[in-house]
Every structure is written in C-alpha cells, then in structure tokens.
C-alpha cells in the first residue's frame, strides 16, 4: 500500500506510480472524471462506476483514494482503484 501523499507531490510523480490521497471530491467534470482537492491543490481523477461501490459522496465529505498517476504530455490525472469515505 502506498503512503499518503499530496496532490502537489502526486502531480510530480512518474506515470503509473501508485498513490494514496486524502481530500475531497469537489465536482463532477464529465463522465467518470471528477476534481479532487486537498490542501496542496487539485487534480482530475477518474473513478469508474464499480469503484464507487454504491457510496454517495458529497463535496463536504473527506475521502481516501488510491490509484495510479496517469500522465500524458498535457495533463496529469489519477486513475482511482479504491475510494473510501472517511467518517
């Protein structure tokens, strides 16, 4: 399991690096893409339907996500493999 990191640090990591982040899903962008935010900044995340596992998350809820950095020439996003609502 990767150690908790920040959005700012995750954006600097290599493609396919496993990351775990704690923060909030602040808005829906399109399809299965969302904006994730922590104290260091924001990053686009991709969360497939099955990863939600029936959980309902609002922008006020804190979540932990784990997945992989997905980098291309223009952007960095996180491909989320696990999402957990923090109570």
Report each predicted region and the residues it spans.
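OB-fold and OB-like single-stranded nucleic-acid-recognition modules
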Residues: 1-87
């Amino acid at each position: 399991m990767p150690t908790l990191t920040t959005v700012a640090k995750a954006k600097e990591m290599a493609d396919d690096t496993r990351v775990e982040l704690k923060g909030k899903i602040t808005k829906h962008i399109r399809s299965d893409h969302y904006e994730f935010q922590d104290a260091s900044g924001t990053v686009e995340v991709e969360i497939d339907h099955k990863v939600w596992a029936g959980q309902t998350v609002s922008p006020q809820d804190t979540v932990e996500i784990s997945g992989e950095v997905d980098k291309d020439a223009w952007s960095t996003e996180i491909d989320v493999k696990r999402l957990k609502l923090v109570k």
